[in-house]
Every structure is written in C-alpha cells, then in structure tokens.
C-alpha cells in the first residue's frame, strides 16, 4: 500500500488536495491552539491527531500555539501538561512553542486600526447591559448609547483602558458591525476587556486582554496558517473570523473549516463538569484513570498508539454523533493483546495446598506471549502451596463450568494437572483452603493415560507471591449519556473503582509505571504511576479481556 493510499480520507483532506492541485497553496500549515486553563481530554486528542496528522502526511507544518488571552484562568502547569500530552501522543510541533501573547503588541495595533476606520468603539455599558442589549435569537439587539463616539474619543478611551484608567468591567472595546444581524456573534462583539491580573508570559505589562475571536484569526494570519480547523461550535464564529481579517491590513487570510467534536459514551467532556468531579472529590484528580483526560487515560494504561488508532477509526465529519465507549476500549484491547507480555496475578485469592507435592518447589517455563515467540519466556516459581482465584473453584458445578470442582481435575497454567479432594472452611462457612493432589507426570503435557482435562486456571506460588493492590477501574458513569441527566453526579457508577488485595508472580516486582501486562484470564493492567511503592505495587486495570458492558446495553 502506498503512502497516499494509507492516508485517511475526509472532507478536510479533500479540500487540502484541491487547494494544492489548484495552486491556491503550495504547502500546508495547520495549528493546535489549546487554552492553557485545564488538562487535555480525548476530544482534544482528535484535534491533535487531525492537525498534526495532516501536517505530517502533507510534509507541512503544525504549530502548537497556546491561546493565552485570559490570565485569570491560565497557568504554566497546564502549558507543561499540554506539551507533554502532545509529545506523548507521538507528535512534534514546528519550531518553538507559540503563544497568542507573543502577538499582544500587534493585536493592540490592529485594534487601533479598527478604531481609526470607525469599526470599533469603547463601550461603557456593564457586562449585564451588554447581554441585555444583544437581543435574542428571535429579537434583534439594540445599539449601545456609546456606539457613535468619535474616532478621537475612542482612541483616547482605549488608551485609558490600556493604562489602567478604568476598573474591571467598566469599559471594553467592541467591534462596530450590526446589532440586527441574525448571527448573535456579529452583534458588536467585544474585542478587548480589562483584567488586572498577572500573565504567565507577559507579567504585568498589560491590563487589557484581547478576546478569543479577535486573537484567533489574527494569530492564524501572522503564522501563515493555511487551514484553520475548529470544531462545529465555532461555525458561526467564522463570520467574525473573516470580518476581522477583511478589515485590517494583513497580507494573509486563512480559511476556517469546522468538523464535529468528539462525544463519547459513559463520560463527560465539559470542562466545568470535569472540574466539578475533581473539586468535589468524586475522582482523585485530573489524572484519575476514570477521567477522559489524556493524563488519566495514560495512567490507566492506554497507549498513544491506541488513541491515535481510535481517532483514525472515528474519522472526521461535519455531523455530530456519539461514539460508543466500546470503540475506544476495542482499540486498546487490540493493541495490548498484540503487544503486552503475559503475567499471572490472583485478584481474589484463596489458598490451595497440593498434599502429595514433594520438595521445596521448582521453576516452570512460561512464554511471555503465546503467539510471539520472539518475546521470549520467563521462569516462574511453582510450589506445593499456591494461590488461585476464588471464582475458579466450586464445590459443585454444572457441565458448563470448566474450572476446578471438588472431586474433579483442572490444569494449572503451564504446570500440572490437579484434583480437588477436600476443603477447609472458617466459622462463617467461607472456604479458607482447598486441598488437592497432582499428577506429577503432567508438567506442561497431557496425562499419559489419555484422560481429557479441559479447564485451565492461573495461579501464583504462595511462597514467592508478590503482594499487590489491584484497582479494578470501570466506566465512570452508569448510563451512556450522563450529561443528559438532571444531575450528572447522580449517575456516577458506584463500582467505577473496586480495590482488591491480591498476589502476583514475582517477576512483576520489576514492572515500571505505564508498562502494560495481560494478567492471564483477567484483563490488561499497568503499574500505577502515583500510588505504587517498591513494598506494595499497585496495578490499574486498563480494560478487561472482553466487553462486559455489551449485554448491559442490549
């Protein structure tokens, strides 16, 4: 398959192909412009993959530009986190990291140009009055009483704003467009507002800050962006994007194109709602493995490749739709099934004693991957006392149950065939120990007499077991569309985190944070980057071996 054939196809790439073929553009230049006021989530990953992927495929450029026009909500912590997320996803920006604040001097000059052209004015209505004067979708707005100030007066008042002569909220600069426009965004939008706050890049140089709609288009033009890609909620804003560039002296006029944002089942993407989850301590932070943030997904064990594959599969369209969580989970499941080494861990342990086993123990050889001999093998200790999962034993069972049953046989993974002989229980009737015998001539082979043993269970040698905490993460919400609930917090899944104390094979003591394993017959897990210690490793479940929610949704 050629490089061109391997590329995804969508309406944006078709536009780019036409622009290059017609000579409108000779190269492609995109940008990813996050606001540094929070952590990126899976929805941002779609935009990252789109913008950086296009630049990569067309051998163009993609800028990372921070839209840092509101110093009150922004922080260098978010800047660093976003840069880390972009790089972790496998992308590299062109040149240095850029900031909208790099252009504050030029933006100020363009604002003065609009004033000189009679296309901007200083308004002293309160923010509440501005909203009232703006009108509604069915009623036109009305002009501010300050709309017809002279150019000279507006220049003087704008300078007064810049030098701190007004209190916050007492004045703003507005574009003079059309208060009767059917598009509310064109009803004299605010271009500059006053904020007495220190900026993480410019310090206290400015007390007036440009609005997103004024900054965004000019920054694109100054950087030579050819295709400015936004989500659909900015569709109406394109009119203002074009109006600003049409009315200032700037040689480049990029075009904005909109695509559908990513909506994912069983989670929320709203920054306000995500913040509420964190501040009200429903989760332990922005990187909680149940969160849809990139840092949360990474901590849970999602790989960059699986997220890129997910973004590729869902595609780029103009129609809003909601993607099934199973689609994202399928991507990581396929990735880890192919690439994760296998290991054994017992999540709900019960002791099993092999009464006729002689000696201190032995080492058994296990493949690190059943289908990839190139991944090698490991030596796992075996002894006469082991841990098995409580769900792998029943005193009585029907024929469909293929695990250990009293009086019947089962195979221990890569080890021996055992037979359950009796059990020991505590005062409450709970099984504390299962007593078995083993067939010494069945190490990794069938019984010599030809009898069939169908079931296979995993195990961990008790003498060599590594005590581990296992965090069984699941979907954060119990309904597909929690955002539609009257109170989205009321539909949090009470079993989104279940903590178990178990045992793992000793090789896992060398696990490193983020390294994925398939715990055989259990699912895919990785060492937690926050809570693990050398004395007590903590493993997070990334995803189960199968979609356990499939039947729930039927």
From Swiss-Prot:
> What reaction does this catalyse?
tRNA(Gln) + L-glutamine + ATP = L-glutaminyl-tRNA(Gln) + AMP + diphosphate
Entry's Gene Ontology BP terms: glutaminyl-tRNA aminoacylation; glutamyl-tRNA aminoacylation
- Its GO CC terms? cytosol
Q: Which residues bind L-glutamine?
A: 67, 212
Q: Where in the cell is it found?
A: Cytoplasm
Query: What organism does the UniProt record list as the source?
Result: Escherichia coli O157:H7
Report the main location listed first in the record. Answer: cytoplasm
Q: Which GO terms describe its molecular function?
A: ATP binding; glutamine-tRNA ligase activity
Q: Where is this region: Interaction with tRNA?
A: 317-324
Binding residues annotated for ATP, in chain numbering: 35-37, 41-47, 231, 261-262, 269-271
| Motif window: 'KMSKS' region | 268-272
Q: Where are the transmembrane segments?
A: none
Recorded name of the encoding gene: glnS
Q: How does it assemble?
A: Monomer.
- Asked whether the UniProt record includes ATP-binding among its keywords, one would answer yes
As recorded in UniProt, its EC number(s) are: 6.1.1.18
| Family assignment from sequence similarity | Belongs to the class-I aminoacyl-tRNA synthetase family.
Q: List, alphabetically, the NCBIfam families matched.
A: glnS, PRK14703.1
Which InterPro entries does the UniProt entry name for this protein?
A: aa-tRNA-synth_I_CS (IPR001412), Gln-tRNA-synth (IPR004514), Gln/Glu-tRNA_Ligase (IPR050132), Gln_tRNA_ligase_bac (IPR022861), Glu/Gln-tRNA-synth (IPR000924), Glu/Gln-tRNA-synth_Ib_cat-dom (IPR020058), Glu/Gln-tRNA-synth_Ib_codon-bd (IPR020059), Glu_tRNA_lig_a-bdl (IPR020061)
UniProt motif 'HIGH' region: location: 34-44
* Top-rank EC class of the record's enzyme: ligase
Q: What is the name attached to this protein's record?
A: Glutamine--tRNA ligase
**Record key words, sorted:** Aminoacyl-tRNA synthetase, ATP-binding, Cytoplasm, Ligase, Nucleotide-binding, Protein biosynthesis
Answer whether the UniProt record assigns the keyword Zinc to this protein: no
